[in-house]
Regions:
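Short secondary-structure boundary/capping segments
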Residues: 111-113, 189-202, 310-313, 390-397
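Common nucleic-acid-contacting/processivity interface regions adjacent to the catalytic cores
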Residues: 15, 24, 271-392, 396-402, ...
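Non-catalytic nucleic-acid-binding interfaces of large nucleic-acid enzymes and RNP effectors
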Residues: 1-74, 197-225, 264-265, 270-271, ...
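Active-site-proximal helix-loop-helix substrate-binding element of RNase H-like nuclease domains
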Residues: 131-135, 141-157, 174, 178, ...
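Short glycine-rich phosphate-binding loop at a beta-alpha junction
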Residues: 175-183, 308
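Extended, Lys/Arg-enriched charged tracts that mediate electrostatic binding to polyanionic substrates
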Residues: 86-105, 203, 207-218, 224, ...
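Conserved RNase H-like, two-metal-ion catalytic cores of nucleic-acid enzymes
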Residues: 3-42, 74, 79-177
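Helical catalytic core of nucleic-acid polymerases
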Residues: 380-519
């Protein structure tokens, strides 16, 4: 099973790390699908209707050439692993990391890119060996190198020596997953930019088993890609899996709240602590990775990420984006069923990338602190998935929608019940999607005739006015139904393991049922 995947766009080469086979380097020519007017030998059905035949010929501008816009990583993971369910790698090399720097200016994105202050220490925990490692600049020779009680302290005479020893240790540990806290914003970008200044790009590339570390500035955020290593930010995972807002996302506050382990207190600032009590500074640096270790022991967010990623066939670093998770899961399902996926609308019409249409989502009332009486809290189980299933939502089942009128969005309710309360002679505009070109056509219809069409064809209609067929279950509904059934399956296995006091299986099945709950 894959542990990491990287596609080199310059050499058109995949680099995939497998838990049994190690590194696999290969090129792959995908199969595209050409839409045809009628069925031919070898043709497969298109999700939105019609037929398509396989071809190896790529044409960027052909709107009838399908599955040409699938992300390279999603494509290869689908091709190699679409038959596998609920399978995760047998092992991972997981390393926790935290860096400390001399205090300078505010840690803005611009400051991090300039990386003006030296790195003073780097703390690591190797999950495989349980070893704690702290590399620290000790210019005055106050401490000796020690390696006992699973704690390795490595003093260095200079920042450059620290960087060299860190890179050697990093290569030795060979992590498949690198985890920090707020590390997507600070630790990893600062490490990249500072190392680039002090030792150069060639040395920075030692962070990658493929010798390729890349920087991109996307949406104003620092993003560092270490080819072959999955970098996960535990703060972002916490925000994903703990959906309620925390009063503070500082590591010490989260550690204190969830595992009763906070940061080490000190007087003054880190610069004075480093100067006056270097051993306390070491403990301070190690405490940060110890908090991450304790959080994972309780919350299991890394294990959850691994499981969800393999259920959906996505790279681990895509876990933060629900759209990628959904796309991976749908591509996997369609591949199994022999159904061809349509291209994204932006593939046919790039101008849609700049089309920022807004629509109303859930209405959230800002809570007002205070003491209240006679309060009812209704928590609907799996509300959005249940809506998808009950309405049979899907692009292939979408019939059309009632065009939004001039009224505020929340005053519009086009459910069948509400339509029947309106004047049957009232005229509304119906928009219909061309599922081949993704263009919209419209026509006008009386509400009375619309109600008859809905009832005669057994369409569902949402409050927003979107109408869906029910003669065939949508792919989204099928996937969700499968996930519901899987969760119940693992909940049963978990209960059985608990009765048998098989706690290893109990924890494993609990993780699986939790993964399907999140999905």
């Amino acid at each position: 099973m894959y542990q990491s995947v990287y596609y080199d766009h310059q050499t058109y080469t995949y680099h995939l790390r497998d838990d049994k086979q190690g590194w696999l380097d290969f090129q792959f020519q995908p199969t595209f699908w050409k839409r045809v007017e009628e069925y031919q030998d070898g043709a497969q059905p298109i999700l939105t209707g019609g037929w398509a035949i396989p071809t190896k010929k790529y044409d960027k501008y052909d709107p009838d050439l399908l599955e040409k816009d699938i992300d390279k990583s999603l494509l290869i993971l689908r091709e190699l692993y679409y038959k596998q369910d609920d399978v995760v790698p047998l092992w991972h090399n997981i390393v926790y990391i935290d860096i400390e720097i001399e205090i300078g200016g505010a840690l803005t994105p611009e400051y991090i890119r300039s990386a003006p202050m030296p790195i003073t220490s780097i703390a690591l925990i190797d999950v495989t060996t349980k070893q704690k490692i702290c590399l620290i600049v000790d210019k005055t020779g106050q401490i000796q190198e020690t390696n006992q009680d699973s704690k390795h302290i490595i003093p260095c005479k200079s920042e450059k020596e620290l960087i060299g020893k860190f890179l050697s240790k990093f290569e030795e540990l060979d992590p498949t997953i690198l985890v920090g806290y707020n590390s997507a914003y600070f630790d990893i970008p600062y490490l990249y930019f500072r190392l680039s200044q002090v030792v150069g790009e060639d040395e920075v590339n030692r962070l990658s088993p493929l010798k390729k570390v890349q920087y991109s500035d996307f949406n104003g955020e620092n993003q560092i890609k270490i080819a072959g290593v999955n970098h996960l930010d535990y703060m972002l995972l916490h925000k994903k899996y703990i959906m309620k807002e925390e009063p503070s996302y500082k590591l010490g506050d989260i550690g204190t709240k969830y595992v009763d382990l906070g940061k080490i207190e000190y007087e003054g600032n880190l610069n004075t602590l480093f100067r006056d009590d270097i051993n306390a500074f070491i403990d301070y640096n190690l405490r940060d990775v110890e908090i991450i270790e304790a959080l994972e022991a309780k919350l299991k967010f890394i294990n959850l990420t691994i499981m969800i990623s393999h259920i959906c066939n996505i790279p681990y670093e895509s876990i933060y984006w629900n759209t990628v998770m959904n796309e991976g899961a749908m591509l996997k399902y369609l591949k199994r069923e022999g159904i061809i996926s349509p291209n994204k609308p932006t593939t046919h019409n790039p101008n849609l990338r700049n089309f920022n249409e807004t629509y109303a989502g859930g209405f959230i009332l800002e809570p007002i602190p205070g003491l209240y009486f006679d309060v009812i809290d209704l928590d609907f189980t799996s509300l959005y998935p249940s809506i998808i299933k009950s309405l049979n939502l899907g692009i292939e089942t979408l019939v059309g929608r009632i065009k939004v009128d001039h009224r505020p969005t929340y005053e519009q309710n086009h459910s069948l019940e509400k339509l029947k309360e309106r004047d049957p002679n009232e005229i509304v505009t119906i928009e219909k999607l061309n599922k081949k070109t993704y263009s919209m056509s419209s026509s006008q219809l009386s509400i009375g005739k619309l109600i008859k069409i809905i009832e005669d064809n057994k369409f569902t209609i949402s409050a927003s006015g979107a109408m869906f067929r029910t003669d065939e279950q949508s792919v989204c509904s099928k996937i969700l139904q499968g996930w519901f059934e899987k969760r119940e399956h693992y909940r049963g296995l978990k209960k059985k393991a608990g009765k048998e006091e098989n706690w290893d299986d109990y924890k494993l099945y609990d993780l699986f049922q939790h993964a399907f709950k999140i999905l």
